[in-house]
Structures are given as C-alpha cells and as structure tokens.
C-alpha cells in the first residue's frame, strides 16, 4: 500500500473535487493543511510503525518557514500564526539558515527511517531559500539534496513571472 504524506498540496486543497480527483488506488493520505515538516515526519513515522503493511511512501515536504512547538500538544506555526510563541520566534530567532537546517534535518531523518521502504520525496519551495549563505550538513548527508520542487513540477522557467503563483496552483 502507498502512503501519501505532506501539507495541503498533498491533501488536495487545490482540487475542486478532492475525493474524485485523487489517486485511484486504495491508499492512506495523512497529509494536513498547514502541516510543518516537523509534524509531517513525526506523523509519518508513527503511522508506519502502526501500519507495517506500507510498501511505498510519497512524502511532500512543506515550505521551510513552517515549524512546530509543544504546548498542550504539538502545534504548527507560521509567520502568520497569531500567538505569542509565533510572534517571538519569527521576530527574534527565525533565520533562513535555521529554516533550511530544519528542512534538511527532517529530510535526513525520514530518509533514514525509510531505508528499507521505497520512497519518493518532493517539496514545496520559496524564493527566500536562495538567500541562505551556508550549505547545510544535513543536505550534504541525504541523497535527496536535489529533490524536485513544486516550481520544477509547474514546468515554467524560473524567470517566468507566473513560475510560482501566490497560493495553491489551480487544477
């Protein structure tokens, strides 16, 4: 059985008929809208531990700006989350280097967990990633260091003004 995991892109948020337009085979899709890479990796590992019949994993990593924190349970946060934790994190601590280290650490962790399960990784991306000045040790350790991004899948050149829309792609 194939397991799908990721954020709203994998969940099917951009589809008018999410259930009707989905992959035709029987499959679990544990993706959630707004899910951070931290929670996606945790949820994926837990799901596979509880469902050892999974034969293949298709994992979509989210934009690196999403993180999680623990306060009465695990919660996702973004620069637009309206709470004290998010405001403090994104104002005083957040950097592109932290974001990218967290992304590639999550890729590496999931890759290691899935070493005996065939898998495919792809990811959403954001232009601000290009401002990172240092390469990342976790990126160097994973075979997915050059994984396909949503921008690659859309098929327009990087220089095209509509290369990446301002929200979810349309059907």
Regions found by a protein language model. Give the residues of each.
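Serine-esterase "nucleophile elbow" of acetyl-processing enzymes
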Residues: 1-43, 49-50, 170
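Alpha-helical cap/lid subdomain in secreted, periplasmic
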Residues: 45-171
